[in-house]
Amino acid sequence: MAKVCEICGKGVVYGHQISHSNIHTKRKWLPNLQRVRAVVNGTRRRITVCTTCLKSGKVQRA
């Protein structure tokens, strides 16, 4: 399962965690993804969707 929303394409973002002493360590921010049953092209499918798309009503749940 890819860490990407199937509706909007939101995915992992990479960057640095910066400590108080200004040391940079690599880290990643993950989207809040949920597996939901939704109606896609008239059929019920299980898709990976971010919670932003769920709250905004871009997904018709089955």
Curated annotation (Swiss-Prot):
<dbReference type="InterPro" id="IPR026569">
    <property type="entry name" value="Ribosomal_bL28"/>
</dbReference>
<keyword id="KW-0689">Ribosomal protein</keyword>
<keyword id="KW-0687">Ribonucleoprotein</keyword>
<dbReference type="InterPro" id="IPR001383">
    <property type="entry name" value="Ribosomal_bL28_bact-type"/>
</dbReference>
<dbReference type="InterPro" id="IPR050096">
    <property type="entry name" value="Bacterial_rp_bL28"/>
</dbReference>
<dbReference type="Pfam" id="PF00830">
    <property type="entry name" value="Ribosomal_L28"/>
</dbReference>
<protein>
    <recommendedName>
        <fullName>Large ribosomal subunit protein bL28</fullName>
    </recommendedName>
</protein>
<dbReference type="GO" id="GO:0005840">
    <property type="term" value="C:ribosome"/>
</dbReference>
<dbReference type="GO" id="GO:0006412">
    <property type="term" value="P:translation"/>
</dbReference>
<dbReference type="GO" id="GO:1990904">
    <property type="term" value="C:ribonucleoprotein complex"/>
</dbReference>
<dbReference type="InterPro" id="IPR037147">
    <property type="entry name" value="Ribosomal_bL28_sf"/>
</dbReference>
<dbReference type="InterPro" id="IPR034704">
    <property type="entry name" value="Ribosomal_bL28/bL31-like_sf"/>
</dbReference>
<comment type="similarity">
    <text>Belongs to the bacterial ribosomal protein bL28 family.</text>
</comment>
<dbReference type="GO" id="GO:0003735">
    <property type="term" value="F:structural constituent of ribosome"/>
</dbReference>
